[in-house]
Amino acid sequence: MALYLQIVGIIGGLYLVSTAFKILSRYSRSWKAARQHGCKPVKRYPNREPFLGSDLSRILKEENKRGKGLEAYANLHRTYGDTFAFKALSPTQLSTCDPKNIQTIATTNFDHWGVEPMRGDTLAPFLGPGVLTHDGQIWKRARANIRPTFNRAEVADLENFELYVSSLLGLIPRDGRTVDLAPLFKKLFLDTATEFIFGRSVGSLVPDSPFNALEFMKAFDASAIGLALRIKAGALKPLLFCFDKTWEKSYTQVHNFVDNQVRKALQPHSDLEKTEKLGHDSEQREKFILLDQMTKETRDPLVLRDQVLNVFMPARGVSATAISNIIFELARHPDSWESLQREVQSINGQPLTFDLIRSLKVAKTIVYETLRIHPPAPMIKRVALRDTILPTGGGPDQLSPVFVPKGTIISVHIYSVQTDPKIWGDDAKEFKPQRWAEGKPLWESKWQYEPFFAGPRMCPGQQMVLTQVTYLLVRLAQEFKGLENRDEVNEYLALGELTVQSKNGAKVSLTPAR
């Protein structure tokens, strides 16, 4: 017994010495940075429970349940500044909405920041190594594989996109009944995402489709929520989720679907099969299919599954969320819907080409404004891969550089910077598309409006999202002259962890144009 206590005492002593050494080393590096670069400490959120910050975590959790989590977080920035430190069931983290710091993280010191220490092991059971979870060579190779998917030819393939849009329009009631468009939009972009990734659509918009889209989307959403919760839990993940089997059940269902697609892609195809895979038109040009491209790099089914899921994860959600939020706002702002109607009527039956879509000023301002107040990914997290410096945020005036030790997690709060009254004026939180057409806007200075983030890790599908969402918006305005809100709750209640959508969907009634 005495020997056991001695061993425990020695181990405990070594742990304390190691911890003390790490703390002293961090303070030493911070002191040197302060002397060399003029770094000063940031303001801190005054946690009442200072060890883990459970008090702030509890507050944010309650606000998220109410659908007010984004606003609560933005209020922290209004109170404690554009860059501050906090604990929320975590070691000390940073949060910033300062444009200079965002630029530094996204581009200037891009290689100082990453995601792998934070996401790699945590997300491995579902996503595995890929563009969302890793840094370095794994990220570079994955990024190079998906880049051809989003070249102009693929982005501008609106003729094929129209096939899916027509199916969606045919499912919208034309008798004034209330309809929640959000689930239909999710089905639409599930179909388009599966086609450009796998070469074949699951056909969720097709009546009596054998594919159970609702069950699959439910499993995928549960998998995504599980990811976000585990990232948020950080070091407490093993304790909080050790007995949770529901996440595994959900992502296994998603894995089974993707594994089936991978098996098909690895099978040799005849020329006839390749033609059928492209669609009914035998003269249709050969398309870039992401999974086929990946099979040229590797034949490992597990690697292919991981790479596909890292693309499928954002591809299926961002566009559906964006168009749902647009309809949410237009149903509450009839003047903006009427302006869109006038612009659409001026098209006079011209084909909706890529160039025409880009020229529609009213539609563009509506899309931009919605992405400003409802960014699909309102918070971007990064971890310092080395000791580094942020250019601003330190000291009482928050204008001095800030020393950031290796391993520190920072939240880039896109929602806060895109609704900051200092940048956008007192009406920053109002839906006001006309602000984009009024003179030379302040936000032409970059880093104040980044709904898809920026730099090497910006969303590679940005142009595709903007093109398809604008096209769908125009087609809805062509097909329906009346848009009426049917949601009993008028305010926007946010739901979600990785991407944020309206808690109540997009409940409207539509009146046909003819």
From Swiss-Prot:
Cytochrome P450 monooxygenase; part of the gene cluster that mediates the biosynthesis of the dimeric xanthones cryptosporioptides. The pathway begins with the synthesis of atrochrysone thioester by the polyketide synthase dmx-nrPKS. The atrochrysone carboxyl ACP thioesterase dmxR1 then breaks the thioester bond and releases the atrochrysone carboxylic acid from dmx-nrPKS. Atrochrysone carboxylic acid is decarboxylated by the decarboxylase dmxR15, and oxidized by the anthrone oxygenase dmxR16 to yield emodin. Emodin is then reduced to emodin hydroquinone by the oxidoreductase dmxR7. Pfam families: p450. This is Cytochrome P450 monooxygenase dmxL3. One of its GO terms (cellular component) is membrane. It is an enzyme of class 1 (oxidoreductase). Its cofactor is heme. SUPFAM superfamilies: Cytochrome P450.
